[in-house]
Amino acid sequence: MKMTKTSVLGLGTWAVVALALAVIGCKSSEDGKVPLTQSGHPEVVVRAKSAGDVKVAIREFFTNRGYIETDSRATNEMMFDKPARSGRSVKALRVIVRIKKETNDSWRLIGIPMGVDGWRSDLQTETEVPQGASQIQAFLVEIKNRVEAGQ
């Protein structure tokens, strides 16, 4: 019974986080919508000579916004966490950015907004937060513009 109560409480907390992301996302995207994509997640195609150039821009973008880069699961993926509250928070927002090689010096960036419970513990769990998709789409567009302007 206690586990169910915790799960319901956790869902309520993530609903608040998702609502906050949706509100912020609507302000940061042009029309508040995420275009239909191959992956079903926010994505853009960036023209760049190397994955290294793209990774530098992604890292700079997120760290300048208070995100902490964390170890990713794969070489073509970057993960960034931001505590839900200042101090020792057990919840965090996570953005996963997958980088896929396309043709002719281009790279597809796929962004996935996540909520993390038990952040920085052995028992952390991730939950996708689709309400944050419009904000992540706007982030990816800005990263694309920065990379392509630097060429």
Regions from the PLM with identified roles:
Residues K2-A15:
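Bacterial N-terminal signal peptides that target proteins for export
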Residues V17-L19:
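Classic N-terminal secretory signal peptides
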Residues A22-G25:
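C-terminal motif of bacterial Sec signal peptides marking the signal peptidase cleavage site
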Residues K27-Q151:
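Ser/Thr-rich, low-complexity intrinsically disordered terminal regions
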